[in-house]
Amino acid sequence: LAMLVPALLVAGAANAAEVYNKDGNKLDLYGKVAGLHYFSDDASSDGDMSYARIGFKGETQIADQFTGYGQWEFNIGANGPESDKGNTATRLAFAGFGFGQNGTFDYGRNYSVVYDVEAWTDMLPEFGGDTYAGADNFMNGRANSVATYRNNGFFGQVDGLNFALQYQGNNEKSGLFDQEGSGNGNGRKLAKENGDGYGMSTSYDFDFGLSLGAAYSNSDRTDNQVHKGTHNTRYGDRFDATAGGETAEAWTVGAKYDANNVYLAAMYAETRNMTGYGDADAIANKTQNFEVVAQYQFDFGLRPSIAYLQSKGKDLGGLNGDNFDSQGNHHYANKDLVKYVEVGATYYFNKNMSTYVD
């Protein structure tokens, strides 16, 4: 249970406050301050979770049909002592160029193209979006070192037809297996490393509120990840809790309806050698993921939400009880990694002030 009282949206990203707009140069500021408390039997998920978030978007007109732009977003945890200097994180930081109807190209820390579809169900007041997507897990959420090309309206020829192409450079720590690492790799957990990868997404927006979309990504796994999953000396390589495949893959399909105060969305996704689970370095060989959400926006400000999310791990290795039969023989296991029903509601006092329970 999460309760937020209150949330002050300095300006939501969709309605950012315009700071400057003159001579083809524009700067918008957005952010929020959230007083947030979790109630849980799990001590690690119980208590104060307050935070502040701030960001800006800038754009400059270079020539006709040619612009430069950038965005930065920063999160500051407000639930620790002032002596805690590490409770901050850069969520987004990228810059690029726009070419009118010919699309945009940018590089930096940005959302992955697989998240284009996942974002449709990641709409819950507090929770959600956690069956397989997550920051710094290959190309599933916010990620480092991504070069992204986006085109909305298919070069101005087909309204509603959008697509994106993306490349991600490696982000890995130096290892014991001739892995040189990258400059930003120190301190990364095993599941947060990645090799070079590519992704793509496409969607079509109908004029009555329905959108359909699909996305795919394929990445090299790092030597650290592959070695961990292929050098189990006790039960053999194939039974290690860390997947040992050379590549990590994800694909997803989804749909949403957003019209007449009704919001409905659903997605299905599968991953290979990608999704971390548990408290150690376990990485699932395969996951099957499903999310569905329904919301309604009342005119007086109330927005109730209900959702169902499930991630099933397939062919999981490890030394847990699930991996042994009654005779003590070791085998693969299938189990739910995420499974819950969400019920929540948000109340908007106005566009800049809200409160919610989830």
Predicted regions and their residues:
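Gram-negative bacterial Sec-dependent N-terminal signal peptides
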Residues: 1-17
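Transmembrane beta-strands of outer-membrane beta-barrel proteins
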Residues: 30-34, 71-73, 108-110, 164-168, ...
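Membrane-spanning beta-strands of outer-membrane beta-barrel proteins
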Residues: 49-51, 88-90, 142, 195-197, ...
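Repeated loop/turn-to-beta-strand initiation elements of outer-membrane beta-barrel proteins
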Residues: 62-68, 101-105, 156-163, 208-214, ...
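Short aromatic-enriched loop/helix-cap "lid" or pocket-rim segments at secondary-structure transitions
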Residues: 118-121, 177, 225-227
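Detector for outer-membrane/organellar transmembrane beta-barrel domains
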Residues: 188, 193-342
